[in-house]
Amino acid sequence: MTQLAIGEATPHGATYDGHGVNFTLFSAHAERVELCVFDSRGNERRYDLPGRRGDVWHGYLAGARPGLRYGYRVHGPWQPVQGHRFNPAKLLLDPYARRVEGELKDHPLLHGGHDEPDYRDNAAVAPKSVVISDHYDWEDDAAPRTPWGKTVIYEAHVKGLTYLHPELPQEIRGTYKALGHPVMVAYFKQLGITALELLPVAQFASEPRLQRMGLTNYWGYNPMAMFALHPAWASSPEMALDEFRDAVKALHRAGIEVILDIVLNHSAELDLDGPTFSLRGIDNRSYYWIRDDGDYHNWTGCGNTLNLSHPGVVEYACECLRYWVETCHVDGFRFDLASVMGRTPTFRQDAPLFAAIKACPVLSTVKLIAEPWDIGEGGYQVGNFPPPFAEWNDHFRDAARRFWLPRNLTTGEFACRFAASSDVFKRNGRAPGASVNLLTAHDGFTLRDCVCFNQKHNEANGEENRDGTNSNYSDNNGKEGLGGPLDLMERRRDSIHALLATLLLSQGTPMLLAGDEHGHSQHGNNNAYCQDNALTWLDWQQANRGLTTFTAALIRLRQQIPALTGNSWWEEGDGNVRWLNKNAQPLSADEWQNGPKLMQILLSDRFLIAINATLEVTDIVLPEGEWRAVPPFAGEDNPVITAVWQGPAHGLCVFQRG
C-alpha cells in the first residue's frame, strides 16, 4: 500500500473499484481527518485524507481490497457548549460502513469525555468498519409493487419469527436465510400477507444499562451502523448481505414485498454519558440537534436526536434509504419516531428530508410508512405527513379495542375508524391506504394478551414495571392471566375473532403482528424490547392452528371485496358502503352517538358485516335478500338466511348476498 491519492468526493463511504478503495467522510467542522487501517494483528497505520470538497474529506488507497478494516480519527475543536466534541484519541466508525467488525461493548475507553475530553485511546476495543464488495447476481428479480389497496402487512422480528420453527433446518432458524426458506414462503402465501415488515435489520447495539443488567436490546431500535446488516442473524458476518438478499429474492418470487423498519431519529451514542464511536466524534454539531448549553435535544427518549434538517444529514439519510432499495431491493420503509424527520425544529410538511424524498425517483416510488410521533413538544403528528407517506393509525388501534373489549366508544367513532379515518387522512390528495390500521405491534400487548391481561407485567425488564404504556384498552374477561374456565376462554376467543375481523375487513392498510394469528402471548409484558428469549420467540408447536386458519380466511375474504381493495374514499351513494342498524335501516343520528353497539356494514352491496358488540345475544334483521355466511364464519351446515341472524354477545358475522 502507498500513501493516499486525493481520490474523489463521491460516492460516499468506502468504495472498492478493483484496484483500490476510495474513502470519503462528511464533516463540516473538522480541521483534519485521519484514515486508520488495521492489519490482521491489529496493527494500525494512519493516513491523512488529502482531499476536501465542500464538507467532504476524501482520499484513495491504492491496493486496498475488500476485507480491509478501517476507522477514522477526526481532529477539531473541543468546545462542548458550541456542540463540538472532536477527540482524535477515539477511533470512529464510518457512518456509511457496509460491514462492522466487533460489538459496542460497555467499556470506559469508548467514552469520549463529558466536560473534558477523554484522551485514552480506544482502538483496541472500538468496533471497526470493513470494506466490502457488494456485487450480487439478482437474476430476474422484480419488485412485486403490490397496490396499497391490496396490501396486507405482517410485522415480524427476524430472529423471533423462525427461531423455534421445527420444520426449518436447525442451523438457519432465527436467521435471514430462514425468511426465504420454502417453509416460510409457503406459510406467508397460505396466510395471505403481501408484505413482510421486519423490525430493524441495520446493525444495532445493546445500551450499556442493559449490558450491565445482563440483558440485550432485542428489537434493534438502537442503531450503530445504518448501512450494515446486523451480523448475528447470518451464518457468518461476511455472509449477512448476500443471505439477506437471497431472502428478498425468494420473497419477491412469491410476490411478497419486504419493508424495513428503520431508525433515522437517533443513534446508539445516546446522551453525553454514552459511547463516542461515530457521529459525535465526526461532527457532533451537524449530526445532532444541540441545545444552547451544548447538550442534546432528546425528542426520542434515547438521549439524542438526529438533525434531519441539516443538508449533510439529509444526504446521509437519503443515501442510506437508497442503499437499501438499490443494493438490497427492499420495497419500502417504516420509520421509527418519524416526526423527527419533519423537525426544523418544529414539524413541517415541507421539511428538507420530506422534500428530498419526494424529489428522489427511487425513494418516492417505494412504500413509506411513518410512526407519526416523537416525544418532543409538537411531536404527535398523526395525519399530518405529506404524500407519499402512509402512517400508523393509533386512532384505529384504540377505537377497535375500546369498541370490543368493552369500553365506552360510540358507533360513529367506530365507523369513522373503520372507514380509514377519513377525518384524519382525507387531505393533501391522500388515499385510504395512507391509514395503516393495526390492533397490535411489537410495542405493546400481543392480541392474546389484550384479552387476558388488564395490567402490564414488565418486571422481567428490570425497571420495576415502570416501563411500557398504561393505556392498553384491554380486558382480561374477569381473570388476570392466560388460563381460566371454558366460558371465559370462549369469550376471549370471540373477542379475538371480532378484533381480527375488524382489522382485516376495514378500509385502509391492515398490519398484522406476527404471532397474533397463533395466539402468541408475552405473558402481559407490553414492552419486551430486551427479552431475547421464549417470551418473544414464536412457539410454532403451540400455535393455535384454528386461529391461523381463521386469519387466513379473513385475508382471502378481504381481497374479494372491491370496497376494500379499490383504495378510494367511500362517498355516500357510491355503492361502496351502507351503515345500517339492527333492523337493517339507516343509522339515525341518535344511534350514531348514543345507540347500542349493534350495527351492520354493507360493503360493495353484497358483503354484509353484522356486529353485536353488546354483552347480550341479540337478533339482527338482515337486509332484504338471501344471505349466506362466508368463511371463516360459515360452518359445515351453512343455510341461507333471509330474515334474522341471532347475534351472540361479542359476535360478528360476514354474509354474502346470494
From Swiss-Prot:
Gene Ontology molecular functions: glycogen debranching enzyme activity; hydrolase activity, hydrolyzing O-glycosyl compounds
Keyword Signal: no
One GO BP annotation of this record: glycogen catabolic process
Pfam families for the chain: CBM_48, GlgX_C
Active site (catalytic residues): 336 (nucleophile), 371 (proton donor)
Entry superkingdom: Bacteria
Pathway linked to the protein: Glycan degradation; glycogen degradation
Region (Disordered): 459-486
InterPro entries with a match to the protein in the record: GlgX_C, GlgX_Isoamylase_N_E_set, Glyco_hydro_13_cat_dom, Glyco_hydro_13_N, Glyco_hydro_b, Glycogen_debranch_bac, Glycogen_debranch_GlgX, Glycoside_hydrolase_SF
Keywords, comma-separated and alphabetical: Carbohydrate metabolism, Glycogen metabolism, Glycosidase, Hydrolase
Site (Transition state stabilizer): 443
Catalytic activity, reaction form: Hydrolysis of (1->6)-alpha-D-glucosidic linkages to branches with degrees of polymerization of three or four glucose residues in limit dextrin
EC number: 3.2.1.196
Recorded family membership: Belongs to the glycosyl hydrolase 13 family.
PANTHER family, sorted: GLYCOGEN DEBRANCHING ENZYME
Functional description taken from the UniProt entry: Removes maltotriose and maltotetraose chains that are attached by 1,6-alpha-linkage to the limit dextrin main chain, generating a debranched limit dextrin.
HAMAP family, per database record: GlgX
UniProt-recorded name of the protein: Glycogen debranching enzyme
Source species of the chain: Salmonella gallinarum (strain 287/91 / NCTC 13346)
Gene name in the database record: glgX
